[in-house]
Amino acid sequence: MALLGRLLPLALALALGPAATPAGPARSPYQLVLQHSRLRGRQHGPNVCAVQKLIGTNKKYFTNCKQWYQRKICGKSTVISYECCPGYEKVPGEKGCPAALPLSNLYETLGVVGATTTQLYTDRTEKLRPEMEGPGSFTIFAPSNEAWSSLPAEVLDSLVSNVNIELLNALRYHMVDRRVLTDELKHGMALTSMYQNSNIQIHHYPNGIVTVNCARLLKADHHATNGVVHLIDKVISTVTNNIQQIIEIEDTFETLRAAVAASGLNTLLEGDGQYTLLAPTNEAFEKIPAETLNRILGDPEALRDLLNNHILKSAMCAEAIVAGLSLETLEGTTLEVGCSGDMLTINGKPIISNKDVLATNGVIHFIDELLIPDSAKTLFELAADSDVSTAIDLFRQAGLSSHLSGNERLTLLAPMNSVFKDGTPPINARTKNLLLNHMIKDQLASKYLYHGQTLDTLGGRKLRVFVYRNSLCIENSCIAAHDKRGRYGTLFTMDRMLTPPMGTVMDVLKGDNRFSMLVAAIQSAGLTETLNREGVYTVFAPTNEAFQALPRGELNKLMGNAKELANILKYHVGDEILVSGGIGALVRLKSLQGDKLEVSSKNNVVSVNKEPVAEVDIMATNGVVHAISSVLQPPANRPQERGDELADSALEIFKQASAFSRATQSSVKLAPVYQRLLERMKH
């Protein structure tokens, strides 16, 4: 596809001549799609265009690149056919469509493009056919035969029963008193029709579809001696009301009418511009819980956000949607507007009950479901659409619901449901305090967080922000989904329960019996002060079992030389904080010893120097501890002086710690993750 994307402009230029070259005049989206259709039909002869027909219908489209490969329009399969491009015709015995259509007047051209019903109705009026056959220059947007036959019987009867007034006026509304080709049909422009100078709304979309009062151009740019004919798929009628006026007169918009008046948006909806209003009906409002609806209606800012979320920044006719589009609302949210067959969808749901109600300043689609933006929601409501239901139940059980439904400015750090696959912690005072430390005292946005920032929690703790290349973490927990910003609170979906730091690295090691031998070694090497003071350390902490696994001779040699012991221990300490969520395929972390540690993560297993880490992310106020089951060796350990004066005392302390470890090993069992987390909070 990438190669095709580079070659396609060149191929188009070769196929179509100088007008298609990059140096030539700019082409409209319609012309670009037509060029692509011509390129696809070239193998069938000159001036042949590929056309996609929607199976089971008579709807045809010139094909763009995406549709050509997908063979779908609005999710429905299409078949490819080949026909003469506009302005050309077949010649018996010749390949393709080599002959240009002979030019005739507008009336005759109506027959050429297949608009025979429009031609017939033109005949019935006294004045119009002479104009179409006489001098001048006109554009006619001619309804197809199917367009006339699909009119309601009462509408058609009213037209044909008064041909020299009603029918004549209707046909004149389809005409402009000059020649207008598709290149001149600009998105959002208005053309002055030949009926009382009433405006015709033009929209020219990036996908090449052109609409006239939301009727799609089927065959465009058919030249005549006195103008041009564009075939369209609907009979269009005059538009006199703006969006606000339509809201005022439609009974189904009673609630919407009151909401617009309360928000002050009526000025926008009756002014100039081109908008799409996804207008919720009374039934749409009734589907919302009364408590939620009353809260929003009583909050001017939330109400304005709610209504703005139903207004698109430009007019979007239904016929312009042939695949999913991401469209931004005035509120700032992006809606996925798509189609499935004849149904329009919003965010994948077929909630549009009436489409293409035209206004002078846009178009209205009726919807039967309210589109509440995140900016109008409470934290509870934000969570309902996120993968955090288990965490929300914990907050509710712990009596913290008021924080999630009120007007308190805060940020909720909610672990995703998979975090609790092995169960949830018991609800008690310590769990409640832990949950309070998942609430930040301000409404934040992740895009404004920076490395080293500290955040105050409702539980009284300070949490640190760590920014890594591919992740953004708060203590040991990293943000797993885009944050959702509500009316007062912001929801961060986190990848694990957060562990607030409870002491220095030395405090953490001393409080865990698994590290008693390491603590003894640190004390003997004179590193206690280093790991107690302020700093940013990552400690790969060998457990007692790791030391006991060393050959006895090697262990004695190590403990007999304090400088070498310090050198090896420093190799276990990185000079920055690296939590597991910040580890990518490979991170090289500089140690206090000077050499670098190679830290990696694969299939949720963290390794250091290819040795698996037994437990990650034991948080400390000056760093993080990762438990490992082996003692790491520097890549090149230079000879050190023995430091004999410390050797005996160091070895004795180490032996005592080792003995203590063996004595307690059989009775001390690893607690479940939540129990260990809660135990740490005691200190």
From Swiss-Prot:
Modified residues (Phosphoserine): 37
Record motif Cell attachment site, residues: 642-644
Stretches assigned to the FAS1 domain: 103-236, 240-371, 375-498, 502-632
S-cysteinyl cysteine carried by residues: 65
GO molecular function, one term: cell adhesion molecule binding
InterPro entries: Adhesion/Biosynth-related, EMI_domain, FAS1_dom_sf, FAS1_domain, TGFBI/POSTN
Domain EMI span(s) in chain numbering: 45-99
Keyword rRNA-binding attached: no
Endpoints of the signal sequence: 1-23
Any Gene Ontology CC annotation: extracellular matrix
Subcellular location(s) per record: Secreted; Secreted, Extracellular space, Extracellular matrix
SMART domains noted in UniProt: FAS1
Disulphide bridges: 49-85, 74-339, 84-97, 214-317, 473-478
Keywords: Cell adhesion, Disulfide bond, Extracellular matrix, Gamma-carboxyglutamic acid, Phosphoprotein, Repeat, Secreted, Signal
Any GO BP: cell adhesion
Modification after translation: Gamma-carboxylation is controversial. Gamma-carboxyglutamated; gamma-carboxyglutamate residues are formed by vitamin K dependent carboxylation; this may be required for calcium binding. According to a more recent report, does not contain vitamin K-dependent gamma-carboxyglutamate residues. The EMI domain contains 2 expected intradomain disulfide bridges (Cys-49-Cys85 and Cys-84-Cys-97) and one unusual interdomain disulfide bridge to the second FAS1 domain (Cys-74-Cys-339). This arrangement violates the predicted disulfide bridge pattern of an EMI domain.
PANTHER family documented for this protein: PERIOSTIN-RELATED, TRANSFORMING GROWTH FACTOR-BETA-INDUCED PROTEIN IG-H3
Described function: Plays a role in cell adhesion. May play a role in cell-collagen interactions.
Subunit structure: Binds to type I, II, and IV collagens.
Protein known as: Transforming growth factor-beta-induced protein ig-h3
Organism: Bos taurus
Gene: TGFBI
